Amino acid sequence: MRLLVINPNTTQAMTDAIGEGARAAAGTGTEIDAVSPPWGPASIEGHAEEALAATAVLDVIARQGDDYDGIAIACYGDPGLYAAREISKVPVVGIAEASMLLACTVAHRFSVVTVIDRVVPMLEDVVARYGLRERCASVRGTPLAVLDIERDPTAASRMVLEESRRAIAEDRAEAICLGCAGMGTLECEVRDGLDGVPVIDGVAAAVKMLEGLVGLGLGTSRRAAFMEPGPKELTGSEPFLEALRGRIPAPSAVR
């Protein structure tokens, strides 16, 4: 099977690292392509950046998505996930949802350890969106900006490990979800520093979930929430809108 892993930011080095992690998690016979949108923010640490990135994700899916058996959105806010499911013909998985659902199978309660504190309320909203407030012990920030992880992975591992230990000791977390796609490179060191506590990388979780969905022949439900878009006039000539017109039929096309 072929899987498309979309890093919603435009930092190529991060996309390359995400791709390596996805390939390491993939089973035999699974081909991974990791891509970034051609436009958008260099990193995602706020609502405005997330909104831009969500639109860029839809752009990538509209142009490339039909060439794959499944799609992963590799940012922990899962930007554009629900909209992506509407326009995609194949299953779409977000790394946050995948990792949290996996955490719920190996632990009673989990904590998310993420980047700067500004992101914490955003991820608390994500937890609530997925109906997991009772299973989430906490969302904890660190001093790390997203792009700091690659610049100094040793310091990043230390900060994530320290905050994970606090989540276990103070919040009674039983599993740790790494709350940034770039943290996959830290998984082994963080896991080795915790005693018997599962550490879940969202990129790996999303790849395995997609492999399962594709293997079982399961696609996105077209009842209610994720129905394909109905006929709608799209105004403008931007390239993104041109790509999206192939997914959202014009009213005249369905008369």
What are these regions (language model features)?
Residues 46-66, 155-163:
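Glycine-rich, highly charged phosphate/nucleotide-binding loops
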Residues 2, 21, 27-49, 67-68, ...:
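C-terminal alpha-helical cap/extension of soluble enzyme domains
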Residues 28, 87-90, 106, 135, ...:
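Short, structured coil segments at secondary-structure junctions
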Residues 13, 104-142, 155-158, 212-255:
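Short, glycine-/small-residue-rich phosphate/pyrophosphate-handling segment
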Residues 90-97, 134-139, 196-203, 220:
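Short hydrophobic/aromatic-enriched beta-strand-loop microsegments
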Residues 124-181, 187-189:
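Active-site rim beta-loop-alpha module in soluble metabolic enzymes
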Residues 54-108, 112-113:
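Glycine/small-residue-rich loop that forms an oxyanion/phosphate-binding "nest" at active or ligand-binding sites
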